[in-house]
Amino acid sequence: MSRRTAREASMKLVFQMAFNDDHVDEVGAEDILAQAKEELNYNNYQYIETVVSRTESNLQKIDEYIEKFSENWKIDRLSKVDLSILRLAISEILFFDDIPTRVSINEAVELAKKFSTDKASGYINGILDQVANQLNKAR
């Protein structure tokens, strides 16, 4: 399984959280991981486990970034798909030093092109660029 496919599985798990009081549904997680089990290698399985766990544990902080840079949009007005993609990418940007920020942003844009509307990729790119710029100023 490529890292891109692992990100897709992770995004699906984060998406499920939006419908389960912002917690991972163990049964749903097992289903998603079972679908990709043939292709999972250890590193990608670890990535999925870690990114979903860190996203879940730091949801409030991640959502604060989304709220801050979602001009004229409340977080509850965002589509669950877009919200999940943003949460996953911001989690990567904040907590995965081994993943370049540009890679996280580009992969989020690709997820949006695949799973969301035509305009979502630009919107997601804009929010993530602002998050990255703020974090670069803080470092």
Curated annotation (Swiss-Prot):
A single GO BP term for this record reads: DNA-templated transcription termination
Gene Ontology CC terms: cytosol
What InterPro entries is this protein classified in?
NusB-like_sf, NusB_fam, NusB_RsmB_TIM44
* SUPFAM superfamilies xrefs: NusB-like
Query: Which cysteine pairs make disulfide bonds?
Result: none
Q: GO molecular-function annotation terms?
A: RNA binding
Provide this UniProt record's keywords sorted from A to Z: RNA-binding, Transcription, Transcription antitermination, Transcription regulation
Which residues are listed as membrane-spanning?
none
Query: Which residues are the signal sequence here?
Result: none
List the PANTHER family: ANTITERMINATION NUSB DOMAIN-CONTAINING PROTEIN, N UTILIZATION SUBSTANCE PROTEIN B-RELATED
* Function field: Involved in transcription antitermination. Required for transcription of ribosomal RNA (rRNA) genes. Binds specifically to the boxA antiterminator sequence of the ribosomal RNA (rrn) operons.
Q: Which family does it belong to?
A: Belongs to the NusB family.
Query: What's the protein name?
Result: Transcription antitermination protein NusB
Q: What is the lineage of its organism?
A: Bacteria, Bacillati, Bacillota, Clostridia, Natranaerobiales
